């Protein structure tokens, strides 16, 4: 399971790297392809996972890569006891609602807020550079 997940992240990260060398902004479709592939693999690994998008325009390639990196760190940290993961992406932020046995407070940083409520972790990061900014 871990190898499948890691392989997916490596593939998508490499793809985003090459795209970012050519384009500053990526269309919504590329964001969706990136996150949707991760969601499919997380589901294949036996964790309930879904995503909803509230995006209205292109996003900086560097932001898409950063969102994928955060998703990777969260899933790796929680992998042994990850029960469910719900992802919400808008132009201004990405929210991860994580039900897991792991402690996720270490993820907190100036760019990432982490809260635990009713047994769920809410991991949130702001997104800059959406829709032509």
PLM-predicted stretches and their roles:
Residues 1-39, 71:
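Signal-transmission coiled-coils
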Residues 55, 102, 127-129:
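Beta-strand elements of well-folded, non-transmembrane domains
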Residues 61-89:
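Conserved ATP-binding N-box helix of the HATPase_c
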């Amino acid at each position: 399971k871990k190898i499948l997940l890691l392989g997916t992240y490596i593939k998508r990260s490499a793809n985003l790297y090459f795209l970012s060398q050519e384009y500053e902004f990526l269309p919504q479709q590329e964001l969706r392809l990136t996150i949707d592939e991760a969601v499919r693999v997380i589901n294949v690994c036996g964790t309930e996972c879904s995503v909803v998008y509230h995006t209205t325009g292109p996003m900086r390639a560097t932001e898409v890569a950063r969102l994928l990196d955060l998703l990777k760190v969260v899933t790796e940290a929680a992998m042994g006891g990850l029960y469910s993961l719900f992802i919400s992406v808008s132009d201004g932020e990405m929210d991860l609602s994580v039900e897991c046995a792991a402690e996720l407070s270490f993820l907190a940083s100036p760019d990432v807020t982490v809260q635990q409520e009713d047994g769920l972790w809410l991991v949130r990061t702001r997104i800059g550079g959406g829709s032509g900014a």
